[in-house]
Amino acid sequence: METAQLINALENVPAEFRPVSFWFMNHFLQPDELRLQIREMADKGYGGFMFHGRDGLRSRYLEQEWEDALRVAIDEAKKQGLDTWLYDENHYPSGIAGGKILEQFPGRSMRSLVVSVEERVAPGATVRLELAQAPRYTFAVPATPSSPPAEPINLLPQLTGQHLEWRNPFAGDAVVLVLVEHLYQPGPGILFESYPDYLDPEVAGAFIRQTHGWYRERFGADLGEQVRGIFTDNACAHFGHIRRAIPWSREFDQRFLTAEGSRIEPLLPWLFLSGPAARASRLRFWRFLGDEFIRIFVGAIRTVCDDARIFSTGHYCLEDGMGEHIRQIGDYFAVMKHQSLNAVDQLGPKTKGGSLFEYPRGIAGAESLTACIRNTASAALFYDSPRVMCESFGLASGWRLDLGEVRRIVGFLSALGADLFVPHGLYYSIAGNRKWECTPDHLHNPMWDYSRAWTDWASRLSFLTAGWESVAEVAVLHPTTTLQAHLELGASKTKPDATDLGAVVDRVEATFRDLVNELLYRQVVHEILPEDVLQQATVAEGTLRVPTRKGKSTCTVRCVILLAIRVIEQRTLETLRQFAQNGGSVLCLYERPDAVYDPVTGVLTDLAAGDLPFELFVPADEAVPAPPELWQRLDVRLRALVPQPLEVRNSHCQVISRVWEKWGRRFYLLHNCSAKPQRNLGVTIRDPRPLLRLDLEQSTPATTTVTADHGRFRLDLEAAETVVFVADSTAAAPPYPVVPAAGASMPEQTLALSGPWAFTTNKPNILPLRNGAIQYAECKERHAFTLHACELSGPVWLLVDHEMTRAELICQRYSSRLKVWVNEQLAGPFHPGTILDHWIFEADVAALLRPGLNRVVFETGGIFLENDHRLWNPYLAGAFTVSPQRARPSLTPPIDQLDTGDWTRQGFPCFAGEGIYRKTLRLPDWGEARMSILDLGRLANSAVVFINGHSLGVRVNPPWRFTLPEMAGGTEVQLEVRVINTPENLFGPKPLPSGLFGPVRLCWKLTGNGDL
């Protein structure tokens, strides 16, 4: 693809590269509303949607109503050119088919084998136990095991009923271990209805038949054409809800015997206790667990999806916790290998502008999100997943989430390797409690109208990166084998900054997370290498030729990092030894491997340090977390071994990068992870070809030729900004538009635009009615609210957010159980909503309001907390302002002028929408030749500017500066500034500053004084 063709392709990116929404089907599904929302998604730059049953769904799941709704959605998606994706559950986790599986298989929920008793017994002493539950296994082992280890003693024959009596025959202390089976039972505070037993072939098979088979039977003609794939969510072999426990299932011991040719019982004590047999026992058990989870669930889904010609995708529980993911899914890379499209989730940060690298749970056990996304991207590269899907934003600052923060997160994810973004989520409805699920939402959010400011941009990033080829010459060996060998299942933490997974796992987790972050901070291009892929590599001239895209291409590695790795597989050791002996570099951090495992025989063999020609770069006694000096030394060492194609100085660990090849070109991406600008960055790109900067912001993408001194240049990055460069040998005279480089200085002369602005809004002002009085009488409840009002003209709508019964949903009107009075006059009728939500009904009550004190009363049947009778905050909406001067809210006449500043203090405290500021001005006499901009100062949260009706574009992050078109001085122009905020002021407890704060200035510079 020629560069000119690339620029043209970026202008209209196909649907397959555009965001795919998690579209929450969370209410009673109506054909007209479904079609409306799909048209909106198409208009706002989405490429598809995932039809996702969610909390609040009132249509019947996997029944005729669900089929009819999906058929409507598929039909409209075809008309709009959108892809359809399926989601395999009603809410999550996947596996219960909306509860049908648990009804079919009662008592077949997730099963654990739990330590119920652990008793230390002195030599010659007798232990007597009255057990609360009949045990599955009971063992006795020496507290100080011998080498070779003795076979555990089976104490089940010593049981009389549930009474256990046993005398310790050993010369030293013994440990008695009692293991019982436990079924997952939801309780107070547990989010999920229940986890099924994913390791039970009957249960998993029934789920696949009743879900995937249901879709295949009814929509088979659309599968593989209109329907692209099906998403599995948050499944796992064991949820970790009981800590001193392992995953278990019906006939698990018999399956182990069949698969492994030996009994599982001798392994079980060493999953919980330390001893010479522990590491080999753990390796065999956790690998068998992973194999079973894939065979019964993950792989079975892949098989039916392949047969239906659709992608199997999704993310799995605790994939971002390295030690925990061993317990929950066995082997992350093996799971990714058995999907046809790899996916991951990243739901934060919870605070707007918060760090994308920090973790909430301290050093040990912290979620390794950056590492997990890098793992997923590398898995996609090696196993040939066409995309890296990322479920995004779900817990990212709630209703405060704005498009600037969305862009900051997307740029970060793109730098890590994601290239198919799935906003979590877009609500079908925000009625009732649904509005408190997960942002960013769509129709109900003012930001929706500006969505193309991120969807077009993100689609271009995806188009450039999808199907990339790696240029990494540094690889980090993934420590799966070490984690499996050392995973402890402690009863509690050993110290405040530790987990219950053991010291070795804690060290691996903390150091692996920090290493990946440091490689990102320091622009070291790398891949995460699973052992099965490394074992397929060939050694040549001091390099590892690692197969990528299932052998369709290769990645040439010159340095392999072993981070805190204690155990590796035999073939891995042989490959690395050959690599090192042929001039390759193997750097060991904290540990050299001390044991090698043969997965064929199940034998673990000790290694001596002298057996390994590997460099121990970081000694075992180095502190964790490592001091900055260590990472600096590692950076110097890596660059001496493997010169990096990109370097950024003065970035303060806030700028990360990505380098890849595609279409025979090399691309370089830089992203500012901070919500603050990064100035005067020293960038070096080591590429002899001319360098173009791609401008992905414009409606028509453009380029700038980069002027560099031997690949070195200075760069400013604004808050959350992402820039992409391409090395292009044909770039000497680009036949495409040229735009100014970023980071330029401000013009020299300014003119302040002071005084009030003409002001209006794109929707009615709104006032939530809160702090009302509640009365109960027999089976009814009354909510009473008071407010002041002046004489108002025009309609004033009363919005009722009241959960409906099924009969009311079908009829689309409230029954007589709901009555509303305004000043003792009955209000209504209420109709489906147009202001907030279809299911938040509205009635015009302007004729019932009066000057002075007003009283609004709602009476409804049933108990307040019953789902079908819950009354949520009502709202008043209309052409009014809200005065904050009284204890009660007061509706005052609308205004048509507003000063710059916070509009929540000027009559719009709860307004969520677009404020439109207009001003007529005469341009200053700035001469014939000039460059000029409009600087809006500060605002919240995004803005678009029009001059004489012509849009100057959308800005979602500062600086809030817009380049003006060429106009002669003295010209009179109509200036319009539109500012939108988030829904936080409507739904949140306290208004956030919103609007155009200013100061607003015209700024210009005469040509010859320097470029903008």
Predicted regions and their residues:
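Extended, non-globular alpha-helical segments
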Residues: R35-D43
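Short, aromatic- and glycine-rich surface loops/edge beta-strands on solvent-exposed regions
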Residues: A174-E181, V723-A727, R855-F858, L975-V977
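N-terminal pre-domain segments of enzymes
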Residues: M1-N12
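Beta-strand-rich ligand-recognition modules
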Residues: L341, Q812-L876, R938-A940, V944-L996
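Acidic/aromatic-lined carbohydrate-recognition and catalytic surfaces
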Residues: H52-F170, V176-G205
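Carbohydrate-binding surfaces of carbohydrate-active enzymes
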Residues: E2, A15-V20, F24, Q30-L36, ...
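Repeat-blade elements of multi-bladed beta-propeller folds
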Residues: M931-I933
